Regions:
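N- or domain-start disorder-to-order transition segments that initiate the globular core
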Residues: 1-29, 33
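Active-site beta->alpha loop and helix N-cap motifs at the rims of alpha/beta catalytic domains
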Residues: 39, 48-51, 56-147, 151-152
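Generic hydrophobic/aromatic pocket-lining and core-packing "Φ" positions
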Residues: 31, 128, 149-152, 173, ...
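Hydrophobic faces of well-ordered beta-strands that scaffold small-molecule active sites
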Residues: 19-25, 40-44, 107-113, 138-142, ...
Length: 358
C-alpha cells in the first residue's frame, strides 16, 4: 500500500516525536485520509460502529439483508455484531502493512467487547480472544471496571493485545496498566511470546472534562470555566508519569477529544493520541507549530482550581478510587449507558432492514 502523505502538524509530530497518531474511526475512507496525516492505528466502539454503518448505508444495509438470509436463526444483535466484525476487518486490512513494519506496536484496529457482557469477566475475556483471532492486527477494548480489570489480565495472559476503555482517571489507568503487566508476566513465566503484543490504556480525556463540568454545575461551584478544559489533560499527564515510574509497558492513549489540547499537550510523550477524523483534519489543516509539551506541567493556578473539586481529586490521584468505585464513577456510568444505547440503536437498524414497517 502506497500512502500519499498530507503535510501538516500531525504528520510533523508523527515523524519527529515518539507520539503515535491513531484515528478514532474505522470508516475506511476516513482511515485512508487519516493515514495520510501519519496515522498508524484506528479505534472503534459501539457508537463509532453505528455511525460508520450509517455513513455508508448504501453498503451496509444491503449487507444486513444478505446476512439475515445467511444467518436465518440469528438475532438482530448477532447480525449487527457480524456487521461490526466485517467493518472492523475491512479497516484492519488497511493497517496490516504498518503492523508488519512496526512488529505489532502500531498498525492495529481496535474492536470493542459487547457492553452487554460487562458483568462477566469470563465473557469479556472469551469475546476478546475471539476478536483477537479474527486478524493478526486486532486490539480489543475492555472496560476499566472492577470486572474489566480481571478480564484485562486474563485476556492479556491469553495473548490478546488489550486497549483499556471506559477509563477516565489515573486510578483506572494505573490499575488496568498493572493488570496488563500481570498478564504479560504470566505469559512470560510460561515461555509464551509477548514480542508482538501492543497493549494501550485509554484515558477518555474529553469525557472526564464533561463529567467534571457537570459536577461543578450541579454543586454550583464558582470557577474559571476555562480551567475545566484542563481536567483530562492534567489526569493524562499524571497517569503518564505513574506509568513511567512503575515501569508499565502499556502505552497511554488519549481519546474522546473536546479541544485541540487533547493532542497538543501530549506531543512528545511515548503515547498514542486518537482524535476523531474531524479533529484530525482541523489540526492538520492548521498552521500550528509542533512543540513537545508532554512533560510541561499544567499551570499552578489551573491545578489549584481543579484540586478544589473533590470529584476531580478522585480522578487525579493514583489511589483516588478503588476498582469497585470505578463502576459508579459518573463517567463510567454515562459512557456504558451510551454504548448500550448504541447497541440498541444497531439492533433497531437491523430490525428496520429485515422487518421494515408496513
Amino acid at each position: 500500500m502506497s500512502i500519499e502523505y498530507t503535510p501538516g502538524p500531525l504528520l510533523d509530530a508523527a515523524r519527529n516525536t515518539p507520539t503515535a497518531l491513531w484515528n478514532d474511526s474505522s470508516d475506511p475512507s476516513e482511515l485512508a485520509q487519516s493515514l495520510s496525516f501519519g496515522s498508524v492505528g484506528a479505534t472503534c466502539n459501539p457508537t463509532i460502529a453505528y455511525t460508520c454503518i450509517n455513513q455508508r448505508r448504501d453498503v451496509w444495509l444491503p449487507r444486513i439483508a444478505e446476512l439475515a438470509k445467511e444467518m436465518p436463526n440469528a438475532t438482530e444483535s448477532e447480525i449487527g455484531w457480524q456487521v461490526v466484525r466485517e467493518l472492523s476487518l475491512e479497516a484492519a486490512k488497511l493497517l496490516e502493512p504498518i503492523f508488519e513494519a512496526e512488529n505489532g506496536r502500531n498498525g492495529r484496529l481496535s474492536m470493542q467487547t459487547d457492553p452487554r457482557l460487562a458483568r462477566s469477566a469470563k465473557a469479556l475475556a472469551d469475546q476478546a480472544e475471539e476478536f483477537h483471532n479474527l486478524a493478526k492486527n486486532i486490539i480489543v477494548k475492555i472496560p476499566a471496571t472492577s470486572v474489566g480489570v480481571e478480564a484485562i489480565e486474563e485476556a492479556t495472559y491469553r495473548g490478546v493485545s488489550v486497549n483499556v476503555t471506559v477509563s477516565f482517571s489515573v486510578a483506572q489507568a494505573v490499575t488496568t496498566g498493572e493488570a496488563i503487566e500481570r498478564g504479560l508476566k504470566r505469559r512470560e513465566a510460561e515461555g509464551k511470546d509477548t514480542s508482538q503484543m501492543g497493549p494501550v490504556v485509554t484515558l477518555m480525556v474529553g469525557r472526564l472534562d464533561d463529567w467534571i463540568k457537570e459536577v461543578a454545575a450541579r454543586d454550583k461551584m464558582f470557577l474559571d470555566p476555562g480551567h475545566l478544559e484542563w481536567c483530562g489533560v492534567a489526569a493524562f499527564k499524571r497517569a503518564y508519569q505513574e506509568f513511567q515510574k512503575r515501569g508499565l509497558r502499556a502505552r497511554m492513549l488519549s481519546a474522546a477529544f473536546r479541544n485541540v489540547m487533547h493532542w497538543s499537550e501530549f506531543v512528545g510523550g511515548d503515547v498514542v493520541v486518537s482524535p476523531p477524523f474531524k479533529w484530525a483534519k482541523l489540526i492538520n489543516d492548521s498552521d500550528y507549530k509542533v512543540e513537545e509539551r508532554m512533560d510541561i506541567p499544567v499551570r499552578e493556578d489551573i491545578m489549584k482550581t481543579l484540586l478544589s473539586i473533590p470529584e476531580f481529586v478522585r480522578a487525579y490521584e493514583p489511589d483516588g478510587m478503588t476498582p469497585e468505585e470505578f463502576d459508579t464513577f459518573g463517567g463510567t456510568v454515562r459512557t456504558l449507558r451510551g454504548f448500550l444505547q448504541a447497541d440498541a440503536d444497531l439492533d433497531a437498524l437491523v430490525r428496520d432492514v429485515i422487518m421494515p414497517a408496513p
